[in-house]
Amino acid sequence: MKYSDTRIYKLAKESQRLAQRVVPPYSSKFSKRTYTQDQHIAILCVRVKARQKLRDMEELLINMPDVQQVLGLSWVPDYSTMCRAMKRLRTKILSVLLYLTACVFPSQGKASIDATGFDKRHSSKHYVRRCKMILGSMKTTFIIDTDSLAILGVHMTVTRKHDTQIILPLFHKVLKSFRIRVLPADKGYDDQKVRDELRKFGVRPLIKHREYGSLDKAHNARMKKEDCGQRSKSETVNSVIKRKYDDTLHTRSYWNQCKEILLMAVVHNMEKGMNIVTVIYWRISTKLCFCKI
């Protein structure tokens, strides 16, 4: 297999192409113009895929001449350059990249929501205390499309916010870009205000009631198992992201940790999109196939 067929090579090429649609080549007119912004974003995406720290990326890129060539790097940026690029990168840009990667997939309006946690063990205890971070992990909530398993929206917090306080802001954010008809969720999102708000926008809430009495059991029995079972797909996406891209955040500042999670979501969607493109390519191929009968 050629190196150009590997997933890291394709990911670097695709992430740079998408970044060129979102950001200008240089962040300022006073820039030294050594590296472009799309090159920095592509390197950060490769870092997520390779599960490496920023300090180890310089050595990794030196051993990848094909990736250097496809990104147009005359020489590899050092650790401090990549740290500054990560710090300058705005979360709005990553949100636009997440939207562009999620638009590739056909959707029927079926979504699901669930929360998970990413460990912040690399953050110092003094920083955790000073910033009033109660949890030792970053609580992350994903809204996914149940047909394609693509991530539509992300919410991050380090405080003890309840699920019912997170679902509506994240839902309104996703609804600006995507159409949602059905939204299953677990009992942690059980709140009548949440149900009323979802119905106001034409969304059918499939949120099971906490069973305090016979009426709650009757409400849960009315829900179809096929529809409520789609909620487990959001747990599948949480598990896939943690296994493929690591469940530990290596950056220390809060905003860099948010960017790290957004980069994981962007890379997840891009890899899903590359699988679809590969399948379509093989389906429309005009090569003759001979088989023995």
Question: Which residues make up each language-model segment?
Answer:
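Basic, short loop/linker segments at the boundary and entry of helix-turn-helix/winged-helix-like folds
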Residues: 2-49
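Short, conserved phosphate-binding/catalytic loop or strand-edge motifs used
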Residues: 63-66, 76-84, 213
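A short, polar/proline- and glycine-enriched secondary-structure boundary/capping micro-motif
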Residues: 162-166, 217, 286
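Basic, amphipathic alpha-helical segments enriched in Lys/Arg and hydrophobic/aromatic residues
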Residues: 226-293
